[in-house]
């Protein structure tokens, strides 16, 4: 069910009367999360588990603290999440050779395969979600979003 604010916006309002960007992004995010959760559940993953696999598919984490920072997750809650993923054979943690108190975190081949499967399903859902836009608008949106996500300057500065 759409809220009256969404319906008002969809029906067209002047720019001065439009909803705040935060509210509009929240509606879009809620729709995307609602569409992603069944895809994740069908593959035995929660949203946070998928976030971890996606990050580790990009690059191994030098340690658990770095991973927590990169995915913006509470470091104290991350341990239980990593325990679950490791028990399922989706990630591996090894003591850091330079600091035995620290553990490197990497995705396993099984985790990489599951990530690829889920990512393909999500990409298909996203294509359907964005089908209301023209191809040019889709390309523009996908080009603009990273600029809004990343801070000014070097994207690596925020990692």
Question: How would you describe each model-predicted region?
Answer:
Residues 1-43, 159:
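N-terminal leader segment of winged-helix/HTH proteins
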Residues 3-4, 33, 61, 65, ...:
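Charged, amphipathic alpha-helical coiled-coil/dimerization segments
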Residues 14, 29, 60, 71, ...:
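Flexible interhelical turns and helix-capping residues at alpha-helix boundaries
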Residues 17-24, 28, 77, 103, ...:
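Conserved acidic
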Residues 20-23, 51, 66, 77, ...:
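Active-site phosphate/pyrophosphate-handling residues
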Residues 26-29, 54-58, 119, 146:
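Short, locally clustered residues in the helix-turn-helix/winged-helix DNA-binding domain
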Residues 30-77, 156-159:
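N-terminal helix-turn-helix DNA-binding core of bacterial DNA-binding proteins
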Residues 80:
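Conserved alpha-helix in the HATPase_c
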């Amino acid at each position: 069910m759409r809220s009256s604010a969404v319906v008002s916006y969809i029906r067209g309002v002047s720019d001065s009367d439009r909803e705040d960007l935060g509210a509009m992004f929240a509606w879009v995010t809620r729709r995307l999360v609602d569409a992603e959760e069944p895809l994740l559940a069908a593959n035995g993953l929660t949203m946070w588990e998928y976030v971890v696999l996606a990050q580790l598919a990009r690059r191994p984490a030098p340690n658990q603290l770095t991973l927590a920072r990169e995915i913006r997750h509470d470091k104290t809650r991350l341990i239980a999440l990593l325990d679950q993923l490791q028990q399922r054979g989706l990630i591996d943690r090894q003591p850091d050779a330079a600091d035995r108190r620290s553990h490197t975190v990497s995705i396993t081949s099984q985790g990489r395969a599951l990530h690829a499967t889920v990512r393909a399903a999500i990409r298909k859902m996203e294509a359907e979600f964005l089908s209301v836009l023209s191809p040019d608008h889709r390309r523009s949106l996908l080009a603009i979003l990273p600029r809004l996500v990343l801070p000014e300057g070097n994207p690596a500065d925020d990692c």
